[in-house]
Regions:
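Hydrophobic ligand-binding cavity/cleft-lining segments
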Residues: 2, 6-68
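Hydrophobic pocket/interface hotspot
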Residues: 43-54, 82, 96, 104-106, ...
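Extracytoplasmic/periplasmic/luminal assembly and interaction segments
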Residues: 41, 51-101, 138
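Beta-strand/loop substructures that line and gate deep hydrophobic ligand-binding cavities in soluble
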Residues: 107-155, 160-162, 171-173
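Amphipathic, soluble alpha-helical interaction motifs
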Residues: 57, 163-166
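N-terminal targeting or signal-anchor segments and their processing/structural boundaries
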Residues: 28, 34, 166-173
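Extracytoplasmic/periplasmic, Sec-exported soluble proteins
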Residues: 36, 46, 88, 145-152
Length: 173
């Protein structure tokens, strides 16, 4: 009985410490990465606003070639939705909730995403971000989210750059 009381005591102390620790951590997070892509904005927009194209550049399909992806809603742009199932990267969904040639906003199961396209002298500056708020007992995860998400964003943007720069630009007469 004494051993059981010790286990209960240390379990309670651990739970209180963990809960107290979460009181001092912001539950809000934001991860953002940018890249310069040497093509006109419309080429980047066409690749990002068409969710079917993501498997050509986003890192998650490279991590799991068996990932199952389904698309509903619009073909591209506002209202386009993507659902995925994967033993490696998990299950989730994404929906484009705002869309224009300057960027778009997405809704995910665990946060919000946004894209910003800014024309530059040499092409397009592309920014990709995700933000959200963790549940109280998961607040500690905000300390690690940058390390978890940022490398995937960087690899995805690098893949997007390679893909977009391989597409010939249309000439306007």
């Amino acid at each position: 009985m004494k051993a059981l009381m010790q286990i209960l005591k240390w379990t309670l102390i651990t739970m209180l410490a963990f809960t107290s620790f979460n009181l001092f951590i912001s539950p809000e997070y934001k991860v953002e990465r940018s890249i310069e892509i040497n093509v006109p904005t419309y080429i980047v927009y066409e690749q990002v606003s068409d969710l079917h194209q993501w498997e050509n550049w986003a890192v998650w399909w490279k991590k799991d070639s068996l990932m199952i992806t389904n698309y509903t809603g619009e073909e591209r742009g506002l209202g386009a939705k993507m659902f995925w199932t994967s033993d490696v990267v998990g299950d989730g969904h994404l929906e484009i909730i705002e869309c224009s040639s300057q960027g778009m906003k997405t809704k995910l199961a665990w946060g919000n995403g946004s894209w910003h396209f800014e024309e530059t002298e040499n092409g397009t500056n592309v920014s990709w971000s995700m933000n959200g708020k963790m549940p109280f007992l998961m607040s500690f995860m905000t300390m690690f989210i940058e390390d978890i998400v940022a490398p995937d964003f960087e690899k995805g943007l690098t893949g997007l750059k390679a893909l977009c720069e391989s597409i010939p630009a249309k000439t306007i007469d």
